[in-house]
């Protein structure tokens, strides 16, 4: 597939997702980085988003809870170019009923080449990057060219 460039803005749109056993870990991470995160636009699956809002006062655009379709809503936003970074603390030791949604979310983040953190160390690397508060160019699939080729 041909690629094109997308510029991630200085003010990032960040999705925050956590499985039940990882929610407290994500909450701690958000609280530790609240001064940086408040400069960006935050999205989250339902329970996670509401817990973050309650604990920090940060404004969070909450989707549905993950098992009710929230993971798919975040994935749709990624496909539409509306999410720039995904912080997803998932529990590799416990299966969840919506595992296919989880796999689809991670697949879309990879397809659309956005930065993804699935653990605290990687999330710290992303947020501490010297480029985190700057516009950054990424390569993404050239969907218009892809569609034009398919419609020939």
UniProtKB/Swiss-Prot annotation:
GO terms for cellular component: cytosol. Substrate binds at residues 19, 23, 45-48, 65-66, 98. Residues 6-152 form the MGS-like domain. Keywords: Lyase. It comes from the Bacteria. It catalyses: dihydroxyacetone phosphate = methylglyoxal + phosphate. The keyword Heme does not apply. Its EC number is 4.2.3.3. One of its GO terms (molecular function) is methylglyoxal synthase activity. Pfam families: MGS. One of its GO terms (biological process) is methylglyoxal biosynthetic process. InterPro entries: Methylgl_synth (IPR004363), Methylglyoxal_synth_AS (IPR018148), MGS-like_dom (IPR011607), MGS-like_dom_sf (IPR036914). PANTHER family: METHYLGLYOXAL SYNTHASE (PTHR30492:SF0). This is Methylglyoxal synthase. It comes from Escherichia fergusonii (strain ATCC 35469 / DSM 13698 / CCUG 18766 / IAM 14443 / JCM 21226 / LMG 7866 / NBRC 102419 / NCTC 12128 / CDC 0568-73).
């Amino acid at each position: 597939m041909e690629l094109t460039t997308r510029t991630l803005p200085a003010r990032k749109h960040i999705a925050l997702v956590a499985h039940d056993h990882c929610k407290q870990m994500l909450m701690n991470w958000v609280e530790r980085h609240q001064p940086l995160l408040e400069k960006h636009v935050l999205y989250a699956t339902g329970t996670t988003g509401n817990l973050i809002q309650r604990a920090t006062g940060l404004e969070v655009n909450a989707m549905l809870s993950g098992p009710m379709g929230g993971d798919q809503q975040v994935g749709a936003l990624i496909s539409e170019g509306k999410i720039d970074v995904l912080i997803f603390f998932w529990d590799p030791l416990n299966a969840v009923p919506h595992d296919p949604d989880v796999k689809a979310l991670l697949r879309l983040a990879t397809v659309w080449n956005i930065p993804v953190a699935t653990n605290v160390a990687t999330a710290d690397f992303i947020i501490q990057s010297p480029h985190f508060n700057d516009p950054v160019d990424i390569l993404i699939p050239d969907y218009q060219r892809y569609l034009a080729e398919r419609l020939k």
